[in-house]
Amino acid sequence: MEQNLSNLIRPMSVVAQEAINYISGRRDHSITSLKTRWAKFNKQCMGGIEPNTVYTIAGISGSGKSSFANEISTDIVDLNPGEEMVILIFSLEMVGFRQVGRTLSSKLRKTTSTLYSSETDLDDDTFRKVISVSNQLKEYPIWFVDNPTTPKEAEDIIKYFYNTYIKGTDKHFVIMYDHALLTKPIGSVIETMQELERVFISAKKYPMTSVLQLAQMNRNIESPERINNPLSHYPMRSDISSADALFQASDYVIVIHRPEILGIQEYGPSHLPTQNKVYLHILKNRDAGKPCILEFQNDLAYNNLIES
């Protein structure tokens, strides 16, 4: 027992050297964040998706949070050609092939409605492009988990992937979890969320590992009192379901919001425009970055956001 406990204790000399190694690695670019397509987002988040970090991305239904996360999953492959990685996506809200459908929508500039022949059959030329891009996507180092798991099952899957594909290499390990409230319960919602966040805190301590989890907003932000008061338009910590557990575990807490879908024409005390706009609020930045708002043009018809 004493020997096991001693493995949990490390002297300052070891931890300080780890800090030196990390700063040195960032300085000589042997350790890098994974860039996304959004320069302002990258700037606020230490260059992109940073190792040993938990990101929480929250929003109401229809806000674009899943599309935002989906773009990140392919961006980090496309925009970081010198980096090796493994991406594990827990796609609990939709089956994996529909996630790929969203990626095809973005890359081909076709709506998913068009790709799925909802009104007219997809034309031959576009279908050939679907096949071509899909064959490229088959080479991406991405794996999917479609079925909801308990926190312990998620932890076992993460450990398996780390030991099988990451351990002993310099690869990035990116875990994406869509989304937290769809976790198979082990008790109350609060108990389940607390255990899930324990899993993510543990996982981010693996070398070169990042966790991105999606979360749901509660209904508070949709109340008439909030909608009719510009001072109350912006999302707050209390608007996120299971906020205490998520905030404690997260290095970044990000809320994606489309005030337009709530009927708001001028957003917040600064009267920001809402037509075809999506706003990204960074509510928490553990590295002391100030809370900020990033503006995007709504391109969600093609499962994309365009940084303004």
Locate predicted features.
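C-terminal regions of RecA-like/P-loop NTPase motor modules
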Residues: 6-17, 109, 113-120, 125, ...
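Hydrophobic/aromatic beta-strand patches that form the interior of the parallel beta-sheet core
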Residues: 55-57, 88-90, 143-145, 212, ...
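Helix C-cap/helix->beta junction micro-motif
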Residues: 83, 206-208
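Phosphate-binding/switch loop-helix module in NTP-utilizing enzymes
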Residues: 141-205
